[in-house]
């Protein structure tokens, strides 16, 4: 089910990111835009880095964040890479196929 939020361009779709707020017509979560902005990337630059988004969509995401900060912070925390994994090299171990 797609649920339109009170912000233009922002929707929730239970089939995309478990219903996390996203930009309508994309799979881009509001949190992705917010994380760039919190790193100091200005909105104009965000729309250049994410060229599939318009300035209106970027500002809609930031407006949604302004009204729902606790919710977006929760999504950011859920998707944070644990410090123990940051900078580590994950190694692929080849396994022979099991033949029955």
PLM region spans:
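N-terminal first-folded block
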Residues: 1-28
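Long, charge-rich, low-complexity alpha-helical segments
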Residues: 29-100
């Amino acid at each position: 089910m797609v649920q339109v939020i009170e912000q233009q361009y922002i929707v929730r779709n239970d089939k995309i990111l478990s219903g996390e707020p996203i930009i309508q017509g994309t799979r881009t979560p509001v949190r992705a835009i917010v994380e760039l902005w919190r790193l100091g990337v200005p909105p104009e630059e965000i729309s250049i880095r994410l060229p599939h988004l318009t300035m209106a969509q970027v500002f809609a995401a930031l407006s949604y964040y302004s009204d729902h900060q606790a919710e977006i912070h929760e999504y950011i925390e859920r998707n944070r890479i644990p410090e123990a994994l940051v900078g580590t090299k994950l190694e692929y171990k080849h396994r022979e196929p099991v033949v029955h």
